[in-house]
């Protein structure tokens, strides 16, 4: 695998962990879903700490990864619209999915801004 693909996969994993860990670390409501109910728990239970961790993940990715910052930002939340689409096709009701995906884009913006800040930090550090 090329470095770019590894970095995008790393962004996906770190982004999902940043969103999921605060949800699972506290008491949360368990939701039913046609596909991966655990993902619905994450989507319905996102907390401000989740977004803060997503920003920190973006900063770390921006410092250490070479992929474009917008790719890192989108990659960090790519699991959310992917889950939403699969869940829709399996019969769940996502009648407000355009709004849902707009919110996911705002989450990606959080991570992208973090990655841009990480790039600025990397330029200031002498390796």
Residue positions per predicted region:
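Alpha-helical transmembrane segments of polytopic membrane proteins
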Residues: 39-54, 99-110
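Membrane-helix boundary connector in multi-pass membrane proteins
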Residues: 82-105
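Alpha-helical transmembrane segments of multi-pass membrane proteins, especially transporters
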Residues: 7, 72-76, 80, 103, ...
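Aromatic-anchored segments of alpha-helical transmembrane domains
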Residues: 14-25, 74-88
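Hydrophobic, membrane-inserted alpha-helices
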Residues: 53-61
